[in-house]
Each structure stands twice: as C-alpha cells, then as structure tokens.
Amino acid sequence: MITISDGVSAGARQDDAGHVLADRLLVLGFEVDRASVPDERPAIEAALREGVVSHELVVTTGGTGLTPRDVTPQATLAVIDYEVPGLAEAIRAAGRAKTPMADLSRGVVGVRSRTLIVNVPGSPRAALESIEALVPTLHHALETLGGPFDHGAAGAGQEARPDLPNPEAPR
C-alpha cells in the first residue's frame, strides 16, 4: 500500500487513510506493506514498479483529485500494461452513491505483469468506501491474474487459489 502525500512522506502529517486501508486489507487476509511518497510522478512511478515485484495487489491512496500535484493517475498509467476500467467505474459509482464529489476522482485501476494496481482517494472515508466497492470482484480478479484459471469450472474460487485472501472476511 502506497500513500501519496507530500505531508505524510515528509512526516508532517498522519497517514489516516493509510491506517484505515491497512486495517481493512488485513481483515480481508492480505499481508500489508506500507510506503509513502511525495506527490511527484517519478517517485510514484518508482514506488509502483517496486511494489509489483513482490505483491499481487498494490493500492495507492491520494493524488487522484484535480489539483496540479494530483499526479497518481498519470504515474499509474505510465506503469501499467493495461487498464481495468470497470473496477475504477465501480469505485466511482460506490462513491457517487454517497456524494457527487466522487466523480472528481481520477483514480485508475490497471495491471502490470500479474499485479493489480488500484488508485483510491486520499480521504479515509473515500478510501475505505473504494476498497469496499471492490470486495465482490477483487478475489476473482487476483485469481485470474495469478495463473491458469478455468473460468468455466464449477466452484472455481478458493479451491483454485487457496493462497489468496478471502474477500468475504467480516468488516
């Protein structure tokens, strides 16, 4: 998990969104490594490239808005092999149900190699709501990226990749 924030990376601000996300990802069964980088495209790109080396999922929080320093989507687009627009749309749709301001988030979801990269907003509430929007499909997405997967097999899921976290874990 990568927090993109000038204040957090400088130690001048607490990483509230990062704490909330890490807690939820742990409950979902993920091992969570955390990093923070400033709102600078080269730093974000480097952190993403480093994260995909050893993780099946990389979640970023912050830098998805409209200010000139919100460059997380541009950095992500430079790193990924392809986008998964349906997941980004699901995040925005879930947020839109709470506030029309969710449509101002430019977060991207995409894949580099076999790693899913997800951008979520920097506010703790919006970040958590974004992850919750992905819970129904996250497990299947990671299974599909993780290797051979028989999409037609009855009951394909945990049996196919028991090493993956359980998306049905309680909140």
Language-model regions, residue ranges each:
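Non-catalytic beta/alpha edge segments that cap or flank active sites
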Residues: 2-171
